[in-house]
From Swiss-Prot:
Residues in cross-link Glycyl lysine isopeptide (Lys-Gly) (interchain with G-Cter in SUMO2): 78
InterPro entries per UniProt: LLPH-like
Induction: In the hippocampal neurons, down-regulated by sustained activity induced by increased extracellular potassium concentration for a prolonged time (2 - 5 hours) (at protein level).
Cell location: Nucleus, Nucleolus; Chromosome
Function: In hippocampal neurons, regulates dendritic and spine growth and synaptic transmission.
Protein name: Protein LLP homolog
GO cellular component, one term: chromosome
Region (Disordered): 1-23, 57-76, 104-130
Organism of this sequence: Mus musculus (Mouse)
Tissues/organs with expression: Widely expressed, with high levels in testis and spleen and low levels in heart. In the brain, expressed in the cortex and hippocampus, and at very low levels in the cerebellum.
Assembly mode: Interacts with CTCF, MYO1C and with the transcriptional machinery, including RNA polymerase II and TBP.
Similarity comment text for this entry: Belongs to the learning-associated protein family.
GO molecular function term, any single one: basal RNA polymerase II transcription machinery binding
Amino acid sequence: MAKSLRSKWKRKMRAEKRKKNAPRELNRLKSILRVDGDALMKDVEEIATVVVAKPRQEKMQCEEGRCDGADEEKDDMKMETEIKRNRKTLLDQHGQYPVWMNQRQRKRLKAKREKKRGKSRAKAAKGLAW
């Protein structure tokens, strides 16, 4: 399909705007990422998710051999996220597909599974016939 003059003009203007604002944006990002500094956490939270450093420090201490009760917390965390999933079919123990899988793919895999299941049942029925 041909590109319209309007879309070409819009693209050109966006590119010029990016060129104009690039130094300002770069300075803003540098000020946010500056470790020593003046950057406010609110600015950082606008751009990225902030992770608290405490769990990482505890992990480092455990590696050095100074663990004290952190094992209990790890067990609790495992309990929350422990999902047993079949690697071949991607189904979990409740028969649910992963959240990231789209509906078409789920439907296709289900149909494939049902088709395979139907073939095996038909063969068993045929073998039982007198």
